[in-house]
């Protein structure tokens, strides 16, 4: 499968995975900053979001994956990631964020709202960037 860097897909997955890392390097970081701003608009703990982002944004095999995940964990006071099972094999991974509280089912709509506000900020930023060229 494209994007997989483990056997038996390594021969066809390594180049697409690395290309994805390069192409999404800036968008991942911009998205993290937009998510932090969205958290501020929603009254979430932006200081914790920034602190966890600075500390945990590199705690993933992909250089881009933990960017927004770390902001989200900090904003909501959650501990995310950690060990995971893939295809019957346990992969030991670092945690992202602090376990300030237990994850509950109420966190699902909170994260959905956070993602929606982040996406709206991205849309506004895109429109603002395009506006000078439209005139």
What are these regions (language model features)?
Residues 3-135:
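Hydrophobic alpha-helical transmembrane segments
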């Amino acid at each position: 499968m494209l994007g997989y860097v483990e056997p038996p897909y390594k021969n066809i997955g390594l180049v697409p995975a690395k290309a994805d890392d390069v192409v999404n390097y800036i968008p991942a970081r911009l998205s993290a900053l937009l998510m932090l701003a969205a958290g501020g608009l929603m009254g979430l703990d932006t200081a914790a979001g920034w602190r966890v982002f600075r500390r945990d944004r590199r705690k993933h095999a992909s250089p881009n994956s933990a960017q927004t995940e770390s902001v989200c964990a900090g904003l909501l006071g959650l501990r995310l990631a950690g060990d995971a099972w893939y295809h019957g094999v346990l992969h030991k991974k670092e945690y992202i964020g602090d376990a300030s509280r237990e994850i509950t089912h109420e966190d699902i709509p909170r994260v959905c709202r956070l993602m929606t506000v982040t996406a709206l900020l991205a849309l506004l930023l895109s429109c603002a960037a395009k506006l000078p060229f439209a005139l």
